[in-house]
Amino acid sequence: MATAHHTDQLHSLQTHGIHCGETTIPSQGDELPAYIAKPDQHTGPYPVVIVVQEIFGVHEHIQDICRRLAKQGYLAIAPELYFRQGDAKDYSNINELVNNLVKKVPDRQVLVDLDHTAHWASRHGGDTKKLAITGFCWGGRIAWLYAAHNPQLKAAVAWYGKLVGEKTLFLPKYPVDVAIDLCAPVLGLYGGKDTSIPAEHIETMRQALRAANADAEIIVYPEAGHAFNADYRPSYHAESAQDGWQRMLDWFTQHGVSAIPIPEETQ
């Protein structure tokens, strides 16, 4: 069992060389909670990566992704996009979480919150002329949608986000519907063993992207399932996750969202 001293040491390693913590962002008449991480070895401004949560909210795994990006030289920020409808931590059953909370969060609300997040970042050390987004699971779908929403976005990376699905008043479109509207290059990272996103859905999306002549690429990892980057779950597939992480960083750089060089001792 981990001791308090061990836990403190681990947290110190995770936060060495960066500033990180909770903040709030004015958005749509509310104060939107968010987690932010950025380097402390440079005056900025920093290229910005918006990190969009899994269905479980901005929990430790998403915060860790922000810290990892900060150690690469980015200002990374993850807004709590469910906060008006509820708190994911209040649910222990995934089906109840999805039906009672996640499905009640309107896409329109989410996209505007992300706009306000980008604006806030531009006033707090971020360079939104170098703006990217990445999202996981629920957030992977949102990353596709945001790439068709914000013309200032330079790059997007969507990790195992649903591509097609049942449309509702709150979820009127899926990535396959916005392929023709993409205004930023998108990299999709998917698992070949993901039963929730079958191969035919991926092929449908690829066809839509080709028809739209979109600047996008989908990578499928044959041995990975859903949530293969979630290193706190049995679904984690280290080889695919590590390759996907490097592809994400390369995608950002390739499309004009290069990280600020950070001294190796802070990484």
From Swiss-Prot:
Stored SUPFAM superfamilies: alpha/beta-Hydrolases
MF-aspect GO terms: carboxymethylenebutenolidase activity
Enzymatic reactions: 2-(5-oxo-2,5-dihydrofuran-2-ylidene)acetate + H2O = 4-oxohex-2-enedioate + H(+)
Keyword Acetylation among record annotations: no
E.C. numbers: 3.1.1.45
Domain of life according to the entry: Bacteria
Name of this chain's protein: Putative carboxymethylenebutenolidase
Gene3D superfamilies from the UniProt entry: alpha/beta hydrolase
UniProt entry keywords in alphabetical sequence: Hydrolase
Organism in which the protein naturally occurs: Yersinia pestis
Catalytic residue list: 137, 194, 226
Family: Belongs to the dienelactone hydrolase family.
